[in-house]
Swiss-Prot record:
Cross-referenced InterPro entries: DUF58 (IPR002881)
Lineage of origin: Bacteria, Bacillati, Actinomycetota, Actinomycetes, Mycobacteriales
Family: To M.tuberculosis Rv1480.
Pfam families, per the entry: DUF58 (PF01882)
Name of the molecule in the record: Uncharacterized protein MAV169
Length: 169
């Protein structure tokens, strides 16, 4: 987890983006604990602010309570980073997969049934993640690695702006 103090200005924007881009990955075999990371956000900070949580949200949904606690005091934005292979398997036959966090390797034959089951399970998990985040009052921005994430951010900001303007009337 990386904490970046809120500041304004072009230099601070660039520092924030550089911090996000250069944040190191967890070592192989170390599983991230999103609930603990979110809970750590609320400990030292006393002033209200914004918490941006960037994750693939692929693990168990055991972070609703800390997210709700942080959202009660701060504005929260959840950014889901999604790879297409996280939601649908390619049609390639036999494959060896390695879990990037645990290092465990397994061999599979990817057939139509497995692809369909995987897609359904992934869609159900993503729906649960979105429902959980929204139940805490936070918006979710999904950025896919196979799309132009700048365009996705622009669409998200425009939709949020339209919603804010509609609320003022």
């Amino acid at each position: 987890m990386t904490r970046v103090p809120a500041r304004s200005g072009r230099h601070d924007e660039q520092t924030l983006l550089r911090t996000i881009a250069t944040t190191p990955r967890a070592p192989v075999g170390v599983r991230g604990d999103l609930a603990t990371a979110i809970d750590a956000l609320r400990r030292p900070e006393r002033r209200r602010g914004m918490a941006v949580i960037i994750s693939d949200f692929l693990g168990p949904i055991n972070w609703q309570r800390p997210l709700g606690a942080i959202a009660a005091r701060h504005e929260v934005l959840a950014i889901e980073v999604l790879d297409p292979r996280d939601v649908e398997l390619p049609d390639i036959g036999d494959v060896v997969l390695q879990d990037a966090e645990t290092g465990v390797t397994r061999e599979f034959t990817i057939d139509a049934q497995l692809r369909d089951d995987f897609a359904k399970a992934a869609a159900a998990h993503r729906a649960d993640v979105a429902r959980t985040i929204r139940s805490c009052g936070a918006p979710i921005l999904t950025l896919r690695t196979d799309r132009d994430w700048i365009a996705d951010i622009v669409r998200f900001v425009k939709s949020r702006r339209r919603g804010a303007l509609a609320g003022r009337q």
